[in-house]
Structures are given as structure tokens and as C-alpha cells.
């Protein structure tokens, strides 16, 4: 299950209560999970078979992208970093943390091999854009406008960091 801004974990809890013999995987951004951290206690108290995967980029990524495509520089979307592994462990929930993409496969195998709740904190690039399946001309114009505003507002370093993070992911012939 995947949910933006706080619905992945409640859906996963419902699915786990419906069938306790099935492993449920909840994919959540750090912003959405932080809105419902108390539900981790529900997982623990009921020993629900839910693996919570947190995409931890220390930003409200979708909110940021929505602002950028509307021509506004992102404002108040970055958050202080949180170590969700330590947070889960403080609740006696087994947890793992991935900071290197090469560790993903083995970490997920470890997580899925456990019974009961487990949290996987996947640290991701805060500048990596979540690209929608289709992009309109208006979104391109809005994004270009917001980047221009950022540059003229003294944020050229941020624009360059975003460009570097995203250009490396474009396939080359």
C-alpha cells in the first residue's frame, strides 16, 4: 500500500487486521508517516505483520513539487532530519536503515523475513524530484518560473543541487 500524506499506515493496519497471516508492506514518505507516528504503537501493541518502508528525504516532496510546478519557490517544505530507525527502536519495533542504495536488496530481504512489525528507514536524496507520469506545458512553465525566482532570490546553489541530483538519473544513449 502507498499513500501520500498519512494514509499508507492506517490502510496497512486495516489490511493486517483483516488477515493477520499475510505480510503487509506500507510505503510512506517521511512527511506522511510523521503525521501519524502514534500508529506505530498500534503496530507494536497488536504485533501486526506490517513492514513500514519510509522514504526519508527530510522534505515534504510532493508539496514541494506542487509549489514548484505552480511557479512558486518551495517554502517551508524542508524538515529537520529524523532517524526513523531509532524512533521505531525506541518503541521496541525492530528497525533497519538504508543509506546506500546497494544495501536495499539485503535490507528488504531481512525486513520481510521477520515476523510482526518492522520499519525500514530509507534515506533518499532530498533534491530528487518525484516526476508525474505525464507533464503538461503549464507545469514546465511553472517549474521554470519557480527556478528563475529562486535564482534571482539568491538560491542558485539550491537550483544547481537539484539539477545535479536529477540529471544523473536521465538515461543516456
Regions found by a protein language model. Name each.
Residues 1-173:
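Thiamine diphosphate
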Amino acid at each position: 500500500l502507498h499513500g501520500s500524506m498519512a494514509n499508507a499506515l492506517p490502510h496497512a493496519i486495516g489490511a493486517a487486521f483483516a488477515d493477520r497471516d499475510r505480510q503487509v508492506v506500507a510505503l510512506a514518505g517521511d512527511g506522511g508517516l510523521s503525521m501519524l507516528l502514534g500508529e506505530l504503537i498500534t503496530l507494536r501493541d497488536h504485533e501486526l505483520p506490517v513492514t513500514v518502508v519510509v522514504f526519508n528525504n527530510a522534505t515534504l516532496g510532493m508539496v514541494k513539487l506542487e509549489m514548484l510546478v505552480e511557479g512558486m519557490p518551495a517554502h517551508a517544505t524542508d524538515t529537520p532530519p529524523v532517524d526513523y530507525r531509532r524512533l521505531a527502536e525506541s518503541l521496541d519495533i525492530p528497525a533497519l536503515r538504508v543509506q546506500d542504495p546497494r544495501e536495499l536488496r539485503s535490507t528488504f530481504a531481512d525486513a520481510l523475513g521477520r515476523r510482526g512489525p518492522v520499519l525500514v528507514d530509507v534515506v533518499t536524496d532530498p533534491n530528487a524530484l518525484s516526476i508525474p507520469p505525464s507533464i503538461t506545458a503549464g507545469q514546465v512553465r511553472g517549474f521554470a518560473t519557480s527556478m528563475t525566482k529562486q535564482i534571482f532570490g539568491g538560491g542558485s546553489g539550491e537550483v544547481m543541487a537539484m539539477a545535479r541530483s536529477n540529471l544523473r538519473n536521465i538515461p543516456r544513449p
